[in-house]
UniProtKB/Swiss-Prot annotation:
This is Small ribosomal subunit protein eS24. It comes from the Archaea. InterPro entries: Nucleotide-bd_a/b_plait_sf, Ribosomal_eS24, Ribosomal_eS24_CS, Ribosomal_uL23/eL15/eS24_sf. Pfam families: Ribosomal_S24e.
Amino acid sequence: MEINIIEEKENPLLNRKEIRFECLYEGESTPKVLEVKNKLVAMLDADKDLLVVDKIDQGFGEPRATGYAKIYESAEKLTEIEPEHVIKKNTEASEEEEEE
């Protein structure tokens, strides 16, 4: 899987950086949100707890997808702005079990 950053912009009103990316996955299945998140964290040298992959849109029959991610400046802003279901899909299973 290869990820290319298409656009990166600051959003000072919401204290976050917004990233549009393209994901190429020739001969592989569509990547999961957590796989993309981990790759973006490594590429952007970001804190894994502050990066949220909002969506991944796949073209029919194409080995590529476009996506939208956000990097927040603080965990408080992330929980204040993002809906709970988006936070949940960006959390690994082991972290969810620890919270219960």
